[in-house]
């Protein structure tokens, strides 16, 4: 992005901002997610990204050392942060601490769009092992969330 102003196009798209694949790791399980990098400035040492999860879709269940700061811009859904399952609506804020399992899911009838700020330099996400999943699924609310029954 070289221009100082990128005009809003339609449906949460911006002129001159590419819609990118969500992940490039074939092992990461997700459904119906796109990513746009809105700001990447080395002097700020952060990136502001827009993710959109299609109706009924979900992001990868993952954890990492860096934090996420999330603002829901569009739609409704649910998120898992640690063992906390919460409903999401427009303008809700979600803070994801380091090394915390997290995932976002869109409601069936509408997309879930959110801004996510992260450090420019960050570690790669870790996917859960079978043991990690078993531990998470020991909590009935988390197990229901992971099955998509929230």
Give the positions of each predicted feature.
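A short hydrophobic beta-strand segment most commonly corresponding to one strand
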Residues: 50, 95, 110-127
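A generic "binding-loop/recognition-motif" signal
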Residues: 57, 65-66, 84, 100-101, ...
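Glycine- and acidic-residue-biased ligand/ion/polar-headgroup-sensing regions
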Residues: 66-68, 72-77
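Short acidic-glycine-tyrosine-enriched beta hairpin
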Residues: 83-98
């Amino acid at each position: 992005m070289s221009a100082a102003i990128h005009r809003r196009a339609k449906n949460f798209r911006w002129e001159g901002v590419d819609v990118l694949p969500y992940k490039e790791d074939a092992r990461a399980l997700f459904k119906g997610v796109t990513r746009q990098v809105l700001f990447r400035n080395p002097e700020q040492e952060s990136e502001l990204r827009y993710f959109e999860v299609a109706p009924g879709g979900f992001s990868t269940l993952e954890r990492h050392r860096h934090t996420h700061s999330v603002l829901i811009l569009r739609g409704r859904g649910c998120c898992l942060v640690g063992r906390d399952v919460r409903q999401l609506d427009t303008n809700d804020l979600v803070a994801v601490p380091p090394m915390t399992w997290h995932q976002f899911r869109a409601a069936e009838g509408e997309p879930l769009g959110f801004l996510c700020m992260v450090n420019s330099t960050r570690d790669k996400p870790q996917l859960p092992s079978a043991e990690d999943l078993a531990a998470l699924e020991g909590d009935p609310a988390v197990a229901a969330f992971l099955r998509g029954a929230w």
